[in-house]
Every structure is written in structure tokens, then in C-alpha cells.
Amino acid sequence: MRFTEHEMTAALTGAAKTVLAARRRDVRRVRVDIDTVWEQMDRHARFVLLDGLGDQILPVLVALPDVEVAPGTRPSYSDRSVAEVVEALAGEELGRLRRAVMVRARTALVQSALAALPPRTDPDALTGPDRLE
């Protein structure tokens, strides 16, 4: 699937926030908003998290099959189609059980990244300010 740089960044950031929310007890107990925690993180901590997830998510996003996406909607894939791509990209060095766990976890991670994608805009629509000053 072809994604723009902005879409890839939004997907990766959305998945990173999901992982961060799962790691932090204060976010899980709804004491702190995940966006607040994300903004309070220093750049290096964000980079480390995004770098680790990028190796897992980006190859799968690129390998997903092309689908027709109507303007104003997000691309969506079934868990089965994402799992097939993840299995195809997974190496043979893992055992059967570890491979199955990795495929399920990475499929969930990619689905959270896809959920964070912004809606597609119509490339033929002229959007911009009403007046140029």
C-alpha cells in the first residue's frame, strides 16, 4: 500500500501512544491523558520508542496490498490479511509458538497503527483558504 509520509508518521505515532498507554499504569487507570504523557516525554525517549516500533510496523504497512480508499475514509484491512503479511515478513528463526505470538502481537500493533491513520483527502479537490492575502 502506498502511504504518504504524513500518514506513516501518524500511524507510527498512534501505535507508539498505544504501546506507551499499555506500559504506564497512570494512563491505564485514566489518571493522566496519553497525549499529556506523550508531550511530557523528552525527544530522545520518543525517538527510542518510535525507532523500536518502526522496524516492526513500517515494513508491514508498505507490504500491505493496495486497496481503494474513498476520500474521507481510512484504509482498513482484516486481521487475517494483516497477519498474512506479517507471517510473510517474519523470519524462520523463531519456533512455532513464538512465531504465533509474534504474529498476533504485531498484527494488533499494525491494526492500532491503521486506526491512527488520518482520513484520506480527495486529491482532485481544491482545498485551501477562501482568499489568498
Residue ranges of predicted features:
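Alpha-helical propensity feature that highlights long, continuous alpha-helices across diverse contexts
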Residues: 1-133
